[in-house]
Regions:
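Nucleotide-sugar donor phosphate/pyrophosphate-binding loop at the beta->alpha transition
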Residues: 1, 37, 138
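Carbohydrate-associated surface elements
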Residues: 14, 33-34
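A short acidic/histidine/glycine-rich donor-binding loop in glycosyltransferase catalytic cores
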Residues: 170
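Conserved catalytic-core segment of nucleotide-activated headgroup transferases in glycan assembly
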Residues: 36-112
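Nucleotide-sugar-dependent
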Residues: 110-151, 157-166
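Short, well-ordered alpha-helix to beta-strand connector turns
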Residues: 4-6, 96, 116-117
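Short active-site oxyanion
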Residues: 3-8, 80-81, 152-156
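A short, active-site helix/loop in glycosyltransferases that binds the activated sugar's phosphate group
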Residues: 4-28, 88, 162, 166-167
């Protein structure tokens, strides 16, 4: 079906390469990162040495999609995770004090109220690498949550092999 288009707007150069490897031959334009339009402003700040380190994750929270979330308390016991989204399966968490489940919050409200050190972009089965189908997709995908975190004035934690990793590093 893509071959019916004149031009594709793709997320990034890695997605462009992947599509070419799949046989797509028409022109492509790389978006690089999504805009995030919002009248909301986040003026909250955190000192680098302030404890605990607070990390937000916004998105689908169910075990099937983000199995790694349910293993974080094995390695991140001194951090606190604020989870925004739906379908968090709290019964699968060992140490419930590590997580603050905020539920679904409209994006403008989240931008104004979030108070954290980092935003996390990660998906898949493992806390060590983005694995599984959803994790591997990070190699060519630009998650919209990256733009949300930037709009919240948050530095981003991202897998080193993710398509947006070089953008985040810059």
């Amino acid at each position: 079906r893509l071959s019916h288009s004149d031009v594709l707007i793709v997320h990034n150069d890695k997605m462009e390469i992947w599509l070419k490897e799949q046989g797509y031959t028409k022109p492509m334009v790389c978006l690089e990162i999504f805009d995030y339009l919002s009248p909301s402003v986040n003026n909250n700040t955190h000192e680098p040495n302030q404890k605990p380190i607070k990390v937000i994750y916004a998105g689908a929270l169910n075990y099937r999609k983000n199995k790694y979330l349910y293993s974080l308390n094995d390695v991140m016991s001194k951090w606190q995770f604020e989870l925004y989204g739906k379908r968090f399966e709290e019964d699968k968490i060992k140490d419930k004090t590590l997580f603050k489940f905020k539920g679904f919050v409209p994006s403008d409200q989240l931008i104004e109220q979030v108070s954290a050190h980092f935003g996390l972009i990660w998906e898949g089965d493992s806390i060590h690498t983005c694995s599984g189908d959803l994790g591997i997709y990070q190699k060519i995908n630009n998650p919209h949550k990256a733009s949300l975190y930037i709009r919240c004035n948050l530095p981003i934690i991202i897998w080193k092999e993710a398509a947006l990793a070089s953008f985040v590093a810059e």
